[in-house]
């Protein structure tokens, strides 16, 4: 018999035992070195009838945050007195967009992921997983589509972006040219390397592909001096750096190897980077992600999303984020190791001594006081 078949069968048998007996201690991710388990003290702000505040952005006046949710809306936080209000939508077809979470309707309702404000104009730029790169004015409403295809190929999974206001360009990612957002686990487990990093020129409307062959291209962040742009590769647990200017211009290197699965990257005012972890990685998840044949075999089993996700996060919801220097050095690690308050972090935005924390799966955001 083919050795690979035997190995696959053995691997799947082991995973079946783990899932059957709920042996979380076998594959629970260990604490991160030097971490502070303080995120459970975060203040929780619930969303009314909404789920999945993936990204958070503040407008030029400091109001917000604004966040995109799973039913295609973009909400604005107006403080505890007024709560969340509708600000914008990415699709005009809203008739059936009535459930907080309905993955089967995302292609109709839209799914806004990365958000960034142009601090000069007040326009909000949106990476919608299904409708591409969009923009909406300071007064909100229906977003306008800017980019829906590149090189004749539709954008299937627009994910995140950053804006270079000096050059008037937007760097953005398409996580996959094979899978849609609602199939993100298939992209991660199948060793899909069809992700791209692109540049959109706001004046000429031209799109340039900067990087191809990325593994689930995710979060994007421009350096403070604009010399390089970072892009997170989720399955490989690393952040890649593309040099834009200077003696290294055009070169690509590894900025950081991570002990978790990265989502969005956000730069703070000092030029450091907060990287959100959907989850830390443990023995089982590292093994799965490091051996594509295991992931592909998992996808063939009738496990369903919840059980596979359970495996990947180590059997226990938790939250983690890491702060990196401009050179990729670890400066700070924060956790909610028991998932008491926060879970499945998708973005960390530092503002005025606080961390505003989003989650692509939860019905709330968190505010953590750094002081």
Where are these regions (language model features)?
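Beta-strand-rich domains and repeat architectures in extracellular enzymes and scaffolds
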Residues: 2-11, 21-24, 42-75, 339-347
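Short loop/turn segments that connect beta-strands within beta-propeller blades
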Residues: 78-82, 137-141, 200-205, 243-248, ...
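Asp-box/WD-like beta-propeller blade repeats and closely related beta-sheet repeat scaffolds
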Residues: 95-113, 118-119, 123, 127-188, ...
